[in-house]
Amino acid sequence: MLMPKRVKYRKQHRGRMKGKAKGGSLVAFGDYGLKALEAHWITAQQIEACRIAITRTLKKSGKLWIRIFPDKSYTKHPAESKLGKGKGNVEGWVAVVKPGRVMFEIGGVSEELAREALEYAATKLPIRTKIVKRHEIGGEAV
């Protein structure tokens, strides 16, 4: 699973997911990308499930870039524990994804295969997504 090697503080506030993604909203590395249309926490397990789904669809062709990383910890109390007694233990790691963020990119494959792989990966995520293509203006990639 993806998680930070070390962090300054183990436990974090939940925070709020306001607005759209500031960066990472364009396809930068590959030719096709999977873009989020909603804000959500994407867990390390969901990212791994998408990675496996895409690599199995692509087989040995093409290249995959994962553009999100789970760097936020979330905590949980054990089942049937009373209220209080401090903040719970770290349960897992999540990536905060806002609308407009490109989460996965694929390059070096045909459009049909890329679309098939990204559609399959989208079923593993708890948010609505959109498949986007790299924009080329004047013969130059943007």
Swiss-Prot record:
SUPFAM superfamilies: Ribosomal protein L16p/L10e. Keywords: Ribonucleoprotein, Ribosomal protein, RNA-binding, rRNA-binding, tRNA-binding. GO terms for biological process: translation. The keyword Transmembrane does not apply. One of its GO terms (cellular component) is cytosolic large ribosomal subunit. InterPro entries: Ribosomal_uL16, Ribosomal_uL16_bact-type, Ribosomal_uL16_CS, Ribosomal_uL16_dom, Ribosomal_uL16_sf. GO terms for molecular function: rRNA binding; structural constituent of ribosome; tRNA binding. Part of the 50S ribosomal subunit. Belongs to the universal ribosomal protein uL16 family. Binds 23S rRNA and is also seen to make contacts with the A and possibly P site tRNAs. This is Large ribosomal subunit protein uL16. It comes from Thermosipho melanesiensis (strain DSM 12029 / CIP 104789 / BI429). The lineage of its organism: Bacteria, Thermotogati, Thermotogota, Thermotogae, Thermotogales.
